[in-house]
């Protein structure tokens, strides 16, 4: 389904309809109009009606959640658009911010803070001026069209989010095919790291998806670190997983084949590429 226009409500703007519009814009580079919909708009399959209209009918391009009963699972307009695009489950798995956003939009800050186990004030301490400015500017316009700065930024956001969700699934499958779990011996019984061999062509971020893959793996509690190709050289990067303090890469900082070790010990870069040498460095870094 393609749309000739995206329509959302006027007045104050919230993250859910803003991001929902961004996603729709990524696949439908059309004008965004902010006004109340008419019955004709709701019936027109060429118009995406977002977060307004009291109707969830994806077959007609209508994505509102306000008509759902109060005990409905937290579901916002962003949830509905992600479902329409067929990527909701992956987005819930890969975007840690999505479920809190659903809660905040449908339950408000008090219930969301309680669900997260934090004080209400903590939520607002995490607010970003980027969010505030984009939402405030979006709330001020009646129509956005191609070429306008905010329209272009919204399309970028939508494209990046779509690309992240779609390519991460492919990346995780690839890691599962070629990655290896290494068991590194130590006096106290040893530890496990995830190793990614060098690939050609090398990914833009060779460590992308590694932590997410580990966290979805049954052995995640045993994995202390990651080894992955270094884009800046022929060697490898070594890093902690979940900031495991027992890997301290300052312990290998003086090794001839280690050209960088962060002062806080959580990451290092080495020119070594032989698996046995990499294992030696990891064992030496273990506290």
Listing of model-derived features with the role each one plays in the protein:
Residues 106-201:
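Hydrophobic, aromatic-enriched interface-forming segments
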């Amino acid at each position: 389904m393609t749309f000739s226009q995206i329509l959302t409500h006027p007045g104050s703007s919230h993250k859910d309809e803003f991001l929902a519009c961004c996603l729709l814009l990524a696949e439908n580079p059309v004008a965004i109009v902010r006004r109340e919909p008419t019955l004709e708009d709701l019936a027109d399959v060429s118009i995406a009606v977002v977060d307004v209209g009291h109707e969830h009918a994806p077959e007609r391009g209508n994505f509102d959640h306000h008509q759902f009963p109060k005990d409905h699972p937290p579901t916002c307009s962003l949830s509905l658009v992600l479902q329409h695009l067929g990527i909701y489950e992956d987005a819930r798995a890969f975007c840690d911010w999505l479920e809190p956003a659903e809660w905040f939009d449908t339950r408000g800050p008090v219930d969301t803070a309680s669900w997260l186990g934090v004080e209400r004030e903590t939520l607002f301490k995490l607010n970003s001026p980027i969010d505030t400015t984009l939402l405030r500017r979006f709330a001020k316009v009646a129509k956005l069209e191609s070429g306008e700065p905010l329209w272009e930024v919204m399309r970028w956001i939508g494209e990046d989010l779509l690309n992240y969700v779609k390519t991460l699934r492919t990346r995780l499958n690839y890691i599962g095919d070629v990655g290896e779990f290494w068991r590194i011996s130590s006096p106290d019984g040893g530890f496990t790291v995830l190793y990614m061999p060098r690939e050609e062509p090398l990914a833009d971020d060779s460590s992308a998806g590694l932590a997410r893959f580990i966290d979805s793996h049954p052995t995640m509690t045993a994995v202390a670190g990651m080894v992955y190709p270094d884009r800046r050289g022929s060697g490898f990067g070594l890093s902690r997983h979940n900031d495991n303090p027992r890997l301290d890469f300052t312990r290998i900082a003086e090794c001839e084949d280690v050209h960088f070790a962060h002062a806080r010990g959580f990451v290092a870069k080495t020119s070594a590429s032989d698996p046995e040498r990499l294992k030696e460095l990891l064992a030496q870094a273990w506290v």
